[in-house]
Amino acid sequence: MANSTGLNASEVAGSLGLILAAVVEVGALLGNGALLVVVLRTPGLRDALYLAHLCVVDLLAAASIMPLGLLAAPPPGLGRVRLGPAPCRAARFLSAALLPACTLGVAALGLARYRLIVHPLRPGSRPPPVLVLTAVWAAAGLLGALSLLGTPPAPPPAPARCSVLAGGLGPFRPLWALLAFALPALLLLGAYGGIFVVARRAALRPPRPARGSRLHSDSLDSRLSILPPLRPRLPGGKAALAPALAVGQFAACWLPYGCACLAPAARAAEAEAAVTWVAYSAFAAHPFLYGLLQRPVRLALGRLSRRALPGPVRACTPQAWHPRALLQCLQRPPEGPAVGPSEAPEQTPELAGGRSPAYQGPPESSLS
């Protein structure tokens, strides 16, 4: 009885984990696809290339290593696909290359925003985005090549263990963890820390008096009106929101995976499934964190959604109940502007039942 209860509990936990993993997979595909469309159709974004690169990396990961985690890995995966040595090595290479490409891409995006905010008037000091992203992919390729130096994978009858934590890097695993997680974390922390410091200084700076502003009188009422509030608001609160979310999301998703890479192989294998899918959740969180928190992206997404959805049928205004204005309101196409009170046609003497409201009497020549 106890064994059956334990089996049922493990099956329920595996099913819930599989459902959550599938939700993360769908969210990564849909979110990054929608954000990539918005970025490509919005020419005003200054860091559009970094955002598009991050979306492409997330889509590649969601289309390659995440399905392998659902099909080939043990719970929360299905564990029904048995990969041979060559496909398993390819899966290790993709995992060891795409994860650093994602973390280094996030760090490059943070540094680009730091230069745009802190040094907006010095565009010559910014390296070209193509050069930065080329360096990111070169480093990711070298880190992925380290996975080919590990122990060979097991033959197909054994369970598929094709991740980086399953002996894919061998003695190079600590070096891979430092370059793939510690270095991007330090770069991201420095970039968003600088952004927060600059924003907080701007919030603490007193506003400049407007030109032509009237001087306050020295009366008691004027002194009471300019007293500070009893509960002063902490300056820089809004400025701390975006850096805190970016750094917190990076630490929550990637810190467990990096610590597992530095742990012994036995403990890393025990926590492999949990830390792997926590890291994979970053692919689904990036569109909301780096896309929807930007006002230009939200505005562009709203414009695209309004163009895609059919427009609502406009109703007639209550001021346009004149028969001729009502006939025009019913006959015009739905996309036309609504007839307002200033646009309603004037009443004719025939429809008004005699003289028009603007009738002022006979001309002066007839009175003489």
From Swiss-Prot:
Residues 332-368 are annotated as: Disordered. It comes from the Eukaryota. PROSITE patterns: G_PROTEIN_RECEP_F1_2. Glycans are attached at N3, N8. Expressed in brain; detected in the basal forebrain, frontal cortex, caudate, putamen, thalamus and hippocampus. It is found in: Cell membrane; Endosome membrane. The keyword Transmembrane applies. Residues 40-53, 113-129, 199-239, 294-368 are cytoplasmic. It is a multi-pass membrane protein. Residues 1-18, 75-91, 151-177, 261-272 are extracellular. Orphan G-protein coupled receptor. Constitutively activates the G(q/11)/inositol phosphate and the G(s)-alpha/cAMP signaling pathways. Has spontaneous activity for beta-arrestin recruitment. Shows a reciprocal modulation of signaling functions with the melatonin receptor MTNR1B most likely through receptor heteromerization. Homodimers. Forms heterodimer with MTNR1B. Interacts with ARRB1 and ARRB2 in a spontaneous and agonist-independent manner; leading to the internalization of GPR62 in the endosomal compartment. Lacks the conserved DRY and BBXXB motifs. The restoration of these motifs affects its constitutive activity. This is G-protein coupled receptor 62. It comes from Homo sapiens. The lineage of its organism: Eukaryota, Metazoa, Chordata, Craniata, Vertebrata.
